[in-house]
């Protein structure tokens, strides 16, 4: 299908605009100029975002905030880690992008997107496929606040504790301490995210369950955050 088929929008009530980006068609064949969502979807966003709605919701698949690996990675013993992770140990604490399949690998296009997002009243970016929970502030290259990113936890995919075990607490603390954009992250539990919107706030609930292998489960923990319109998480 054409690029025009890969954007979806749904207006809910009178203050919520839901916009979904499909990245998968572009990931398969990255061009030299590094387009993640492509011109057609960028133009669609340009032509549709405005201040008519209190909240503009962007749904997409990869971390949008600038995130670097914390120093703890540089101090890890590679003998206890699988081979595919060894390359990341060299850049722990170095402040260079480690996941170039995410928006950190497309900084120019991210800036173009941020320019368009400024047209909205209050932006929430809903991010999946990161395997962990995230709550990030989004800033452009001039340190202008753009919106808040909400990364939903994994259900079946491996999260931080599945890969790093007892190092998980230190990794979470490092991400928060060493990245100004990361206000909170959690990689120990599986679950889902609930979002409750009003004109005055957005209530974000990260809900964790005791098992993802059965239809019968119990909620074991919930982390709740309130996001105010056009306001960074402190």
Where do the model's predicted regions map?
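Metal-dependent phosphoester/phosphodiester hydrolase catalytic core
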Residues: 1-234
């Amino acid at each position: 299908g054409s690029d025009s088929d890969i954007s979806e929008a749904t207006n809910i009530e009178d203050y919520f605009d839901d916009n979904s980006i499909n990245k998968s068609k572009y990931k398969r064949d990255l061009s030299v100029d590094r387009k993640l969502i492509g011109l057609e979807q960028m133009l669609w966003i340009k032509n549709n975002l405005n201040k008519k709605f209190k909240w503009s919701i962007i749904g997409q698949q990869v971390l949008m905030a600038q995130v670097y690996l914390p120093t703890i990675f540089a101090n890890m013993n590679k003998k206890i880690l699988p081979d595919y992770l060894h390359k990341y140990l060299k850049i722990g604490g170095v402040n260079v992008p480690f996941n170039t399949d995410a928006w950190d690998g497309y900084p120019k296009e991210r800036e173009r997107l941020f320019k368009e997002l400024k047209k909205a009243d209050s932006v929430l970016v809903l991010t999946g496929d990161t395997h962990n929970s995230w709550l990030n502030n989004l800033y452009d290259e001039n340190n202008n606040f753009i919106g808040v990113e909400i990364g939903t936890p994994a259900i079946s995919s491996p999260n931080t504790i599945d890969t790093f075990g007892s190092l998980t607490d230190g990794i979470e603390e490092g991400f928060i301490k060493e990245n100004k954009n990361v206000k909170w992250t959690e990689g120990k539990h599986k679950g889902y995210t609930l979002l409750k919107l009003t004109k005055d706030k957005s209530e974000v609930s990260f809900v964790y369950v005791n098992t993802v292998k059965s239809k019968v489960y119990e909620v074991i923990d919930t982390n709740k955050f309130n996001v105010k319109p056009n306001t960074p998480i402190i």
